[in-house]
Amino acid sequence: MKGYVVAIFLSSIFLYYVLYCILWGTNGYWFPNEEMKSKNNVKNCFKKPAFASLLRFPQFYPFLCKADFVKVAATYGTNNFLLPYGVKTFESYFRSGLSKLQSCDLVGQFDTVPCKRCVVVGNGGVLKNKTLGAKIDSYDVIIRMNNGPVLGHEEEVGKRTTFRLFYPESVFSDPSHYDPNTTAVLVVFKPQDLRWLMEILIGKKINTDGFWKKPALKLIYKQYQIRILDPYIIREAAFQLLRFPRVFPKDQKPKHPTTGIIALTLAFHICSEVHLAGFKYNFYTPDSPLHYYGNATMSLMKKNAYHNLTAEQLFLKNLIKKKMVINLTQN
C-alpha cells in the first residue's frame, strides 16, 4: 500500500512538470539549454502573466552569450534570418563583439524579487507634466530606450534605470547621463552596429559609414554593463506580435519594430507584470511634442518610413484592452 502511495505521488510530480512545461512553453528538455543557465533566474515566479499567451518561448533568455549563441541560434532558427532578425552570415561579427564583453547575465535584483513588476518607459510627449517619476521608480525593473534622459526630468520619468536599449545612433555620449546601475543593451539592426561596438570597445577610430546619422564616438558605459540583445526578440516583436509579413511587396519599404516595441517584448520575457508609460502618440496634432524632452514635434513621425506606427498603436491598444499590460499614461 505504501509503495502504491509513493508511486501516485511521483506520478503527480511528473504530471505537474509536464503541465508546467506546456503552459510556459519551455523547450521540454530535462535539463535547460545553455541560454537558460544564468546566475539570475529569468522566470522564477509561478504566477502566470496576463500576456503569457503571446509568447511561444516565454523562458527564452534575452541576451547573447559568447559560449552558446551559435547553438541557441540553431535551436530557435535565428541562424536562418539575416539582421535584424537573426545572425545569418554575421556569426563572426557577433562572436567578435561578444568576446569583448565581460558578462551576459541579467542584473542582481533578479535573484531577490521572485515576481517582477516592470515598467517600460517610452519617450512620448504624453509624459510631459504627468509627474509619474515616483511611481516609475517604485517598480522592480525599469526599462528605457535610446537617449530618453532622466537627468532634469526626474519628476516626470523618475531616476532609476534597470535596462536601457540602444543602437549606435541613439546612445548617450555625454558622461553626465552615466548611471552605474544601468545595463545597456545593444539592439543590432545592421552589421555596422557590431563593427561600431568592436571599434568603440578597443578604442579604434570609429568608421561612421553606413549609419543613418552620426553614431556615438565614445561610450559612457563600462564593458561590464553592456549586453547584446538576441535578435530572436526583434524577430518575435515583428512577426509574432505585430504580425508583419516576412516579405514586403517590392514597392514598399520593409517595416521593422520600434525600439519601444522591442523593449516591451524584452519585458515579456523577464517580468511577471508589465506596465507602460509614454507610448501614446497624438497623430492628429502635428505640432504636439513628440518627446517629453526637446523640441521635436509629431510632424516628424509622418516622415518615418522605417516603422509602422499605426500597427504598433493598434497592437498596444489591444494589449491594454485585454488587460495584458497596464498603461500609466492612458489619458
From Swiss-Prot:
Its main location: Golgi. It catalyses: a neolactoside nLc4Cer(d18:1(4E)) + CMP-N-acetyl-beta-neuraminate = a neolactoside IV(3)-alpha-NeuAc-nLc4Cer(d18:1(4E)) + CMP + H(+); a beta-D-galactosyl-(1->4)-N-acetyl-beta-D-glucosaminyl derivative + CMP-N-acetyl-beta-neuraminate = an N-acetyl-alpha-neuraminyl-(2->3)-beta-D-galactosyl-(1->4)-N-acetyl-beta-D-glucosaminyl derivative + CMP + H(+); a neolactoside nLc6Cer(d18:1(4E)) + CMP-N-acetyl-beta-neuraminate = a neolactoside VI(3)-alpha-NeuNAc-nLc6Cer(d18:1(4E)) + CMP + H(+). Its EC number is 2.4.3.6. PANTHER family: SIALYLTRANSFERASE, TYPE 2 LACTOSAMINE ALPHA-2,3-SIALYLTRANSFERASE. It is found in: Golgi apparatus membrane. Glycans are attached at N129, N181, N295, N308, N327. Transfers the sialyl residue from CMP-N-acetyl-beta-neuraminate to the terminal galactose residue on sugar chains of glycoproteins and glycolipids. It's alpha-2,3-sialyltransferase activity is specific toward type II glycan chains (Galbeta1-4GlcNAc) on glycoproteins and glycolipids such as neolactosides nLc4Cer and nLc6Cer, whose sialyl-products serve as precursors for the Lewis X antigen. Critically involved in the synthesis of functional selectin ligands needed for neutrophil recruitment during inflammation and lymphocyte homing to the lymph nodes. The keyword Mitochondrion does not apply. GO terms for molecular function: N-acetyllactosaminide alpha-2,3-sialyltransferase activity; sialyltransferase activity. This is Type 2 lactosamine alpha-2,3-sialyltransferase. GO terms for biological process: cellular response to interleukin-6; glycolipid biosynthetic process; protein glycosylation. Belongs to the glycosyltransferase 29 family. The keyword Membrane applies. Residues 26-331 are lumenal. It comes from the Eukaryota. It is an enzyme of class 2 (transferase). The chain crosses the membrane at residues 5-25. Disulfide bonds: none annotated. Keywords: Glycoprotein, Glycosyltransferase, Golgi apparatus, Membrane, Signal-anchor, Transferase, Transmembrane, Transmembrane helix. Gene3D superfamilies: Glycosyl transferase family 29. It comes from Rattus norvegicus.
